[in-house]
Amino acid sequence: MIPVPDIVSPRVRLLVSVRDAAEAALARDHGADLIDAKDPDRGALGALLPETVRAIAAASGDRLTSAVAGEPRDAAEASACLAALAGTGVGYLKIAWAPGCDAVGLVLPARLPVIAVLFAEDGPSGADVPALAAAGFSGAMIDTRGKDGRRLTDHLSLTQLAGFAAACRAEGLLSGLAGSLALDDIPALAALGPGYLGFRGGLCARADRTGRLDPERIAEGARRLAAFVPRVEAA
């Protein structure tokens, strides 16, 4: 049975991006709340092969799972990317989506939640969220397109990120924040009340996102988030 994503949760949870089944098991055993299938060698949202995603879903046990489906140019390509991974056993899919992108022709998989991932470099804001809800997305996340050392907060202020998270709550959407995050970013970003904080490089040795995950860093991230209780006003 596929674990069902918890769209509204009072606790900020840990998303760990993994590249294979071995990393999925590592993330599962050291406290990841959500195990996210992604190829770090192919940019911000590099999709893995369906068979690799299936293996990751199987190795994740009872943890929630997701898989990135790529960076499509338009709604038609997005539909095809999502369809390619719809039968892999993950709890939901993620797809790159530009603010203001025309959703006409977008076909989302039946009974499988899809998260729109907006890139921080494009200047997304809470004003973009209602259109995402209207298009049928179940959630929205901000990540960084470039993996050049700049972090999420180098592109967007905490005030802007707080507005985005609040808009997601108002629309009943799952929300997430990611983008070269370090463990020390947890207090400031968790206080904004997103559903998830997403990590890859910050949980790898030497902060190299293309390297292997460090189990001690995963456990530390889980511990810090479990200990942090954000105070978020109801939308």
Question: What function would you assign to each model-found segment?
Answer:
Residues M1-S17, A58, E233-A235:
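N-terminal amphipathic alpha-helix/helix-capping segment at the start of soluble metabolic enzymes
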Residues P50-S60, A103-L106, F199-A235:
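C-terminal helical cap(s) of enzyme catalytic domains, especially alpha/beta-barrels
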Residues A59-L174, D184:
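Conserved anion-binding
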Residues L34-L45, T88-G100, G139-G149, L192-I218:
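Glycine-rich phosphate-binding active-site loops on the catalytic face of alpha/beta enzymes
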Residues V12-D33:
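N-terminal basic/disordered segments at the start of proteins
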Residues L34, K38-L64, V68-A69:
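Glycine/small-residue-rich interface belts in oligomeric ring/scaffold proteins
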Residues R19, A44-T52, E77-A80, L152-Q160, ...:
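Alpha-helix N-cap and loop-to-helix initiation/capping positions
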Residues A27, I56, A140, L189:
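Conserved, mostly hydrophobic/aromatic
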